[in-house]
A protein has these predicted regions:
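Alpha-helical transmembrane segments of multi-pass membrane proteins
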Residues: 1-203
Length: 203
């Protein structure tokens, strides 16, 4: 079970950072500036990871469901919600374009509204991502003698996957395949790799 958890979390880390790179390109279109887009992406990721770890972490300690089953459902949710992000961003762009005329908003007010809308769009998938660590940590804590070593190793594997995801996305996949195919490929990692989790939870 521990090896299954490690392998799954490596892939999850890779897919998560693929989304971050692709969403950055999308939000540049919303803000018209990479500076504001990076701020929104980092805020959404940090807020979502914290919220997911807190809420789902508290819940998973009380649920009778197997951690791998919960993890599988979370990953399916990540993949499905991530695929809706481009549609949601496309939907808010006309709204944002109409804001200055409709509200007579200042630059700072308009930027704040853009930021809040972008945060709302990204909060669901990032919160689900945040829930994956406490869920798998529960599984690892039960299979190794040292909780610190088990959870620390799990986190290290996830970060290693994230590094690979950034490098491969930025230098290989995006230039060759484009943003649309890249985000679809990331979702294709989330959903199928959730299936072994669900199967292993029944073993």
């Amino acid at each position: 079970m521990r090896r299954v958890a490690i392998g799954l979390f490596f892939l999850s880390g890779a897919a998560g950072l693929v989304y971050e790179v692709v969403w950055l390109r999308l939000l540049v279109l919303v803000f018209g500036s990479a500076h504001f887009a990076v701020t929104a992406i980092l805020t959404a990721f940090m807020a979502g990871l914290a919220l997911g770890a807190f809420v789902i972490g508290r819940w998973v300690d009380r649920t009778p469901h197997h951690p791998l089953a919960v993890y599988g459902v979370l990953e399916i949710g990540v993949g499905a919600s991530a695929l809706t992000v481009p549609m949601l961003v496309g939907g808010i762009r006309p709204v944002l374009a109409a804001l200055p005329d409709a509200l007579g908003a200042s630059f700072y007010t308009e930027s704040l509204l853009r930021f809040l809308l972008a945060l709302a769009v990204l909060l669901v998938p990032t919160t689900l991502l945040g829930g994956t660590l406490p869920v798998l940590s529960r599984l690892v804590r039960g299979s190794v003698g040292s909780a610190g070593a088990g959870v620390g190793g799990l986190y290290a594997v996830n970060v290693a996957g994230a590094v690979l995801g950034v490098v491969v996305t930025g230098f290989v996949v995006l230039p060759l395949a484009g943003a649309a195919l890249t985000r679809t490929a990331a979702a294709a990692v989330n959903v199928p790799h959730a299936l072994p989790s669900l199967a292993a939870s029944r073993a």
